[in-house]
């Protein structure tokens, strides 16, 4: 949606579709493989007179947010970024989130652990980047997103990210390649870094790792191995 006008044409062309897809499995298939964090971005389509909201990441989905939320009410989707949402649509989205997840939403609290979530029957934490979130105890404040070259952090949740992004010149000069090819070429380095991480409650701990094409590599088993190491240290 924020892309230049000429970019909006690319996904309609078969060649550029290879560079507009960053997953090869549907959400439920990813959950079955062990994925427990989904980065889902929400947008309202331009010139759409309805109140329907869609997921987007350069291109829009055909399924609406409400339908997807209902299907995933027993899972843990995480949304980040809004596009084209006014006050009324934010209110509608918040109402939908609260209606779908209901008592499974963990309210704002000073400290939260997985054990406390289980004991209370909570299954989802929603961080919402809008001032309306201050009016709802079931919504947590915005989780800041920092680039990887900014490592200093304040107390609380935060996200740091590295994006592998192809530009128009790269796409045109590599007609036989795809975004998946680019991502898979970086996986040996990424997995080596993941194996060095320490999950837990320490200041230097890392607890959520998100990546693309996770079912096409050893990413999920590598992350699960970190959890097993954490369990062995705590017993």
PLM region descriptions:
Residues 34, 42-111:
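Metal-dependent phosphodiesterase/phospholipase catalytic core, i.e.
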Residues 34-36, 74-76, 121-123, 154-155, ...:
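Loop/turn elements at helix/coil->beta-strand transitions in domains of secreted/extracellular proteins
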Residues 90, 94-166:
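Active-site-adjacent pocket scaffolds in enzyme catalytic domains
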Residues 1-33, 37, 46-72, 128, ...:
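Long, acidic (Asp/Glu-rich), low-complexity accessory segments flanking structured domains
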């Amino acid at each position: 949606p924020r892309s230049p006008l000429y970019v909006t044409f690319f996904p309609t062309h078969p060649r550029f579709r290879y560079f507009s897809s960053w997953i090869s499995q549907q959400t439920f298939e990813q959950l079955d493989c062990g994925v427990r964090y989904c980065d889902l971005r929400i947008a309202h389509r331009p010139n759409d007179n309805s109140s329907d909201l869609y997921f987007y990441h350069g291109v829009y989905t055909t399924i609406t947010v409400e339908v997807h939320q209902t299907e995933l009410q027993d899972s843990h989707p995480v949304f980040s970024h809004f596009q084209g949402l006014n006050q009324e649509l934010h209110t509608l989205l918040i109402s939908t989130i609260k209606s779908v997840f209901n008592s499974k939403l963990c309210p704002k609290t000073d400290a939260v652990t997985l054990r406390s979530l289980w004991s209370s029957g909570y299954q989802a934490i929603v961080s919402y980047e809008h001032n309306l979130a201050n009016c709802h105890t079931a919504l947590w404040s915005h989780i800041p997103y920092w680039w990887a070259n900014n490592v200093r952090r304040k107390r609380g949740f935060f996200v740091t990210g590295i994006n592998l992004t192809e530009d128009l010149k790269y796409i045109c000069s590599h007609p036989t390649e795809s975004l998946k090819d680019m991502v898979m070429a970086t996986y040996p380095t990424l997995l080596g870094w993941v194996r060095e991480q320490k999950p837990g409650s320490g200041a230097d701990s890392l607890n959520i790792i998100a990546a693309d094409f996770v079912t096409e590599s050893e990413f999920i088993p590598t992350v699960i191995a970190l959890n097993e190491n954490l369990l062995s240290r705590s017993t």
